[in-house]
Amino acid sequence: MAEYCTYEKYVFKKQLETLKSKNGRSTELISLYIPPDKQISDVTKHLREEHEQASNIISKLIRNNVQEALHSLLAKLRSLHKIPENGIVYFTGTVDTGANRTGMVNEVLFPPEPVADYIYRCDSVFYLEPLEEMLRECTTYGLLLLDLREATIGMLVGRQTEVIKHLHSTVPGKQRKGGQSAHRFEQLRRIAIHDFYKRIGDATSEAFLELDPAELKGILIGGHSPTKEEFNEGGFLHYELQKKVLGLFDTGYTDESGFSELINAAEETLQSIDLLKQKKDMEIFFKEIATESGKISYGEDNVRANLEIKAVDVLLLSEELRAERVTLKCRVCGYENKRTRKWKTGEAVPAIGHCPECDSELEVTDVIDTVGELSELADKGDARIAFISTDFDEGSQLMIAFGGIAAILRYNTGV
């Protein structure tokens, strides 16, 4: 099966790429972000106010375009009975389609994570930054912040952080009270520190051991030095969780506000972990090529054939692959054919061309997303789907040398 969010992320990324390529001739493209807790009546009221204000736009063309977009949004809201769990995002407006022509865009996106803020923006481009932030891997990491005063345990799921538990310590400060020897005071202080570390370890273990081991990708520990190092080296975490510690990071805060600081400090570590998984898949692929085991396949037709007989263990797809299977028909002579057209992110979709029989223009009668089709076949055959970045050599080779589509097989099929 595909890893959580893998194919959904690909589809979502494609939608954003399409919207990013659209431009208005003026500030007439509307982006509307509605959080799950927003009242539809409040949004409707706001859009009516915007419609009234738009009547003051000097340019008749821009005024009509903006008001038409607002009419479209109001019509959609009338048919919306409830805001979805993660909120909803609308993009609408008149875009430049080239050759001095324009067209209307009406797109609705259901975000993979909750929309945080209500946003209404009218500009010459669509406002996509909040959705682009959601493209981060939908994985779960444990978070732990600690110093000798407090500890905060939480989780990072996608880009959302959640506090699980907050602990306060009874560790005394470094200034001893009168009547105590320095040695006795330090001894009692070390006992209090040890007890606090144990409380942190027990609470962290209780929180994270409840999760599916495959779901928890790792644990990030932040705080002051040498406190976090002492805790990590002291064996206070359950041994299964200790193996998942990805690194220790300096943070100024150890309450909930320190989570974003910890995540930013660990950014390179988190990125490298995802790339390591991808590199491992590609290493296996190239190893099978080198040993001539026959347990690999590449090229759309061969991979499709192996998927259909459920022989694929891992389906390898380049993140940069954009491909569609199109059915072409000539209305003049009746010629019909199916063809896959490919392009890279940021490139224009290739033109269809002319009929090879009579040189008339071909018409597209059906379009199927190649990645979606192959992913469905992979799911039916219980194959894992791995989207491979081009940010490392082997990932680039998958796109350049193998057309962005390959597979590791369960056995040699001869295909």
Curated annotation (Swiss-Prot):
GO terms for molecular function: sequence-specific mRNA binding; translation release factor activity, codon specific. It is found in: Cytoplasm. Pfam families: eRF1_1, eRF1_2, eRF1_3. SUPFAM superfamilies: L30e-like, N-terminal domain of eukaryotic peptide chain release factor subunit 1, ERF1, Translational machinery components. The keyword Protein biosynthesis applies. One of its GO terms (cellular component) is cytosol. Keywords: Cytoplasm, Protein biosynthesis. Its main location: cytoplasm. It comes from the Archaea. HAMAP family: Rel_fact_arch_1. Belongs to the eukaryotic release factor 1 family. Directs the termination of nascent peptide synthesis (translation) in response to the termination codons UAA, UAG and UGA. Heterodimer of two subunits, one of which binds GTP. This is Peptide chain release factor subunit 1-2. It comes from Methanosarcina acetivorans (strain ATCC 35395 / DSM 2834 / JCM 12185 / C2A).
